[in-house]
From Swiss-Prot:
Topological domain spans for side Extracellular: 29-34
Full protein name: Outer spore wall protein 5
Cellular localization per UniProt: Membrane
Major localization listed first in the record, in broad terms: membrane
A Pfam family it matches: Osw5
Length: 128
């Protein structure tokens, strides 16, 4: 072992430790910042998914409610179709359950020969 071995080893050790310390001064804050951002990403992803599920829950409930209200509104509109008569018929095979059977009134027929020609000519003159 030469007399320069110990000082050379000490120099390399001190140089290595000082470079490692300086590198850790730069790297550790970035690692910490990266850890915080990745944790926030995971947390916000969970919150986003949860809020989406809550919104979807309310959306589904309100769609069902609004469909019922729209059907009620449609039922209140006057119909352009002939009136339908409903009669209840007991089902033969299913006991007490009642089924609704709809009958449509006979459609009215208007033949071309029954329309007076004067009314057609008047309607053409009125439109001009």
């Amino acid at each position: 072992m030469t007399p320069w071995s110990l000082p050379q080893f000490a120099f390399h050790l001190v140089t290595f430790l000082s470079i490692a310390f300086i590198a850790s001064i730069f790297v550790l804050p970035f690692l910490t910042f990266s850890f915080v951002l990745s944790s926030a990403t995971v947390g916000l992803s969970f919150a986003s998914r949860t809020s989406f599920e809550i919104g979807l829950f309310f959306y589904d409930r309100f769609v069902i409610l609004l469909q019922g209200q729209l059907r009620g509104m449609i039922d209140q509109l006057p119909s352009n179709q002939p009136a339908k008569e409903e009669k209840k018929v007991k089902a033969q095979q299913q006991g007490d359950e009642l089924f609704t059977q709809q009958e449509q009134a006979a459609p009215s027929q208007t033949l071309g020969s029954t329309i007076p020609l004067q009314s057609i000519e008047e309607s053409l003159l009125d439109s001009t």
